[in-house]
Amino acid sequence: MREKPMEERENGVRTAHLTGALPMSEMLEMYVDVEKFLGYCAACPRCGRMWSCPPYDFDPEEVWLRYAAVTLYAVQVFPESGAAKAAALADPEMFLRPYRRALDTLLEERERETPGSLRLDAGRCLVCERCARRDAQPCRFPEKLRYSLESLGANVGALVADKLGAPLQWGTKDAPPEYFVLVGAVLTKGE
């Protein structure tokens, strides 16, 4: 199920908010391959350096199996002005940070509204400036720590293309993509 996107424009950037839902059985069958996608995580410099990134002391597949349904929440970010494109090209993570924080806030609200649910954020944990895992220390805020779809083995590229109609795009060294997609989810016990 996919809802019609809501669009906004501000400071040379257009955003579209997307939502979709699917049963966990479909998610597991079509979009989760823990071994494959955690293998990609192993190539990332953040792997083993953040508590929101693998390797974990739990089986990610077990997380999925505790829930019955997945609701996706995403924001497409279109840098349209010259200044927005330059900012997106210079430092994509910083350019996207306010959109990421807004999406994480929405996910937090949805999780709070739905007892027994679990939110998956749009990427790595942003709670601490420097993750305690880098210093071989336990997470300082375990109640705030959330994982991402991809860190638990989800194929985010296929998921957003199929369920939200927003295939991932890649920029070049000279130009950002037409749009970025930030996607998170809320896993729920009931269909």
What kind of feature is each model-predicted range?
Residues 1-6:
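N-terminal amphipathic/basic-hydrophobic helices that include classical n-h-c signal peptides
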